[in-house]
Amino acid sequence: MIGAQKKQSGKKTASRAVRKPAKKVAAKRTVKKATVRKTAVKKPAVRKTAAKKTVAKKTTAKRTVRKTVAKKPAVKKVAAKRVVKKTVAKKTTAKRAVRKTVAKKPVARKTTVAKGSPKKAAACALACHKNHKHTSSCKRVCSSTATRKHGSKSRVRTAHGWRHQLIKMMSR
């Protein structure tokens, strides 16, 4: 019994394999008929021209709306001009107050420059070994090693200073 059942199942699969390609060919033929129907759908596209005529009627309705909008800005322009004139007058007064503060600032800068000059002379006097007042004009001459006087004052620059450390690193 078991052997007979296996033979029957084998016959069914063989018959199904033969029937499947026949169904696929029939399906392809139906698709070709659908392409013929698409040409019939293109004919109602000519009727859409009648719908375009109704669109032209809508433009006439829009023209009436534009006339009402044109009347509104004429009223707004009169109110806007009055407000602009008042604000411009206020802005000019504000700019005048700012210019007065700018004139005061250079006076404060002059005082800072005067304070900085004695600080530079005091700091440079330590590096100067000559018996005269150190100024910015003689800074290069006094700081050079060739014209420096040794003896009375202690040596300011040492071999372990950061300048000498850079010179040693560059020479290596």
Curated annotation (Swiss-Prot):
The keyword Acetylation does not apply. The keyword Transmembrane helix does not apply. InterPro entries: HC2 (IPR009970). Residues 1-77 are annotated as: Disordered. One of its GO terms (biological process) is chromosome condensation. Pfam families: HC2. GO terms for molecular function: DNA binding; structural constituent of chromatin. Residues 8-77 have a biased composition (Basic residues). Keywords: DNA-binding, Repeat. It comes from the Bacteria. Might have a role in establishing the nucleoid structure of elementary bodies. Belongs to the histone H1/H5 family. HCT subfamily. This is Histone H1-like protein HC2. It comes from Chlamydia pneumoniae (Chlamydophila pneumoniae). The lineage of its organism: Bacteria, Pseudomonadati, Chlamydiota, Chlamydiia, Chlamydiales. The gene is hctB.
